[in-house]
Amino acid sequence: MEKIEMLEGILNSYPYPIVFVDNDYIIRYMNRNAEYHYYEERGYKDLIGKSLFECHNNEQSIEKIKMAWEGMKKNGKEVFITLTSRNQRVYMQGVRDYKGNWIGFIERFELNLQK
C-alpha cells in the first residue's frame, strides 16, 4: 500500500469532517465526511482549489479564521472556532512540513460530549 493511500484511508476513517487549507486559504483536501458535509448538506460544489472564504463568506467568519491562523502561527496551539447547530465543535490546527515550516491548517469537527 502506498503511503498516500494509507493516509487517505486514515483521514477517511475519522467520523467527522477534516479540511486542509494552505497558507493562502485555498482548500487542498477534504476527507469523505467533509465532502458530504459541504457538498450534500450545505450545497457547495467543487471546493478543492478554491478559497476557504467561498464557504466562510461573511466578515465575522473571515476575521475569526484569519485571527486564529495568525495566533496558531505564533503559539502553535489548536484553536476552538465554534459549536455547530449539530453539537459539533470545530477546531483549527496548524500543519507543518517535515522541515517545520507552516504549510497550512486543518479544520476539524468533533462531537461535543460536554454537557
Segments predicted by a language model, with ranges:
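Sensory modules in modular signal-transduction proteins
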Residues: 1-30
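Sensory/regulatory domains in signal-transduction proteins
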Residues: 29, 33, 37-115
